[in-house]
Amino acid sequence: MVEKSVLIDALKKAKEQAPERKFTESVDMTINLKNIDMSQPKNRIDETILLPHGNGRVVKIAVLGSGDIVTQARESGVELIMGPEEIERLGGAPREARKIASEHQFFLAETQVMSLVGRWLGPRLGPRGRMPQPIPAGTDIRPIVERLRKSVKIRTKDKMSFSLKVGTTAMSEEEIAENIDAVLKRILSKLEMGDFQVRSVYIKTTMGPSVKVEL
């Protein structure tokens, strides 16, 4: 496991080497894997990871269903709420459905509407790894939404490299380092041989050069 001080040093370098900008940049992390056969589905990583401090960006969430879940969704301030009729309508509006699928990071759906979702929205959500998390009747979705607001989705498919946003330049190095640590711990727990299967890790700001993290 990488020491926190090593991560903080790499983050400081990434910020120092980045050209000064008049906007808040994202801080991105890239992980390159090795010694793993990604043609085998069982080796692929598909994880939702909670970042202790969030990544500093708005995470858009859509809730699909009716009744109590809609009330909770409104109270939670989710970006999109869709009932059964709207789900079915989107089945005949592929362009709009694709836009919704690309703009929202997470989807929650009442179990009662999952069959509708699969039929009408599955072709748009499935390939993006955004099929909804089923929510049984009576479940309080507010803590789920709160958790997802601070989460990132990693889906490698058959790729040996993947990148994700772990913070912004407005956040402290300590906060971003703790986010990176959470990602590394989860990824290593999914690799059969742990850090032996990690080739390299890089950190960069949106417009800055990549800085290698010493493993």
From Swiss-Prot:
Keywords: Repressor, Ribonucleoprotein, Ribosomal protein, RNA-binding, rRNA-binding, Translation regulation, tRNA-binding. It holds the Pfam family Ribosomal_L1. Signal peptide: none annotated. GO terms for molecular function: rRNA binding; structural constituent of ribosome; tRNA binding. One of its GO terms (biological process) is regulation of translation. GO terms for cellular component: large ribosomal subunit. Disulfide bonds: none annotated. Binds directly to 23S rRNA. Probably involved in E site tRNA release. Part of the 50S ribosomal subunit. Belongs to the universal ribosomal protein uL1 family. This is Large ribosomal subunit protein uL1. The gene is rpl1.
